[in-house]
Curated annotation (Swiss-Prot):
It comes from the Bacteria. The gene is ccmE. Residues 1-8 are cytoplasmic. Keywords: Cell inner membrane, Cell membrane, Cytochrome c-type biogenesis, Heme, Iron, Membrane, Metal-binding, Signal-anchor, Transmembrane, Transmembrane helix. One of its GO terms (cellular component) is plasma membrane. The keyword DNA-binding does not apply. Belongs to the CcmE/CycJ family. InterPro entries: CcmE (IPR004329), CcmE-like_sf (IPR036127), NA-bd_OB-fold (IPR012340). This is Cytochrome c-type biogenesis protein CcmE. It comes from Aliivibrio fischeri (strain ATCC 700601 / ES114).
Amino acid sequence: MNPRRKKRLGLILALFVGISATVGLMLYALNQNMDLFYTPTELVNGKPDGTKPEVGQRLRIGGMVVAGSVVRDNNSLEVSFKVADVGPQVTVIYDGILPDLFREGQGIVAQGVLVDATTIKAHEVLAKHDEEYMPPEVAEAMKKTHEPLQYTEQQKQGTGQ
């Protein structure tokens, strides 16, 4: 091979290695940022396709806070509570201030790391609310200037015009 072809081949190989490394690092970063969503039943029994999360895996779990399950530590901000859907209960441990809408019997989504088969150490807890929720300040302002909206059952279910 003449020197010109060697130089061109070296340049092509360097570009190929660089692009491959970049794509590999991007896929690795995307995989690290991916949190799979589970319900308590799916977490304990596995998803329909048979996959179960491994201990140490980052995930999100959603369900209802079980009444009477909230336990607060008197010396710190740590709170533990149980989340359930229609099946088994999963314990969520959270060290921080819970959202204002957090209540027993309320829907939540927690993001964290699986500690064991039925325990999650959460670093974020989000409280869910229904579509009719309105912050108290906004509701008070609306009362002063607007009449409340009266929805029919069809409209609430999204089937009415």
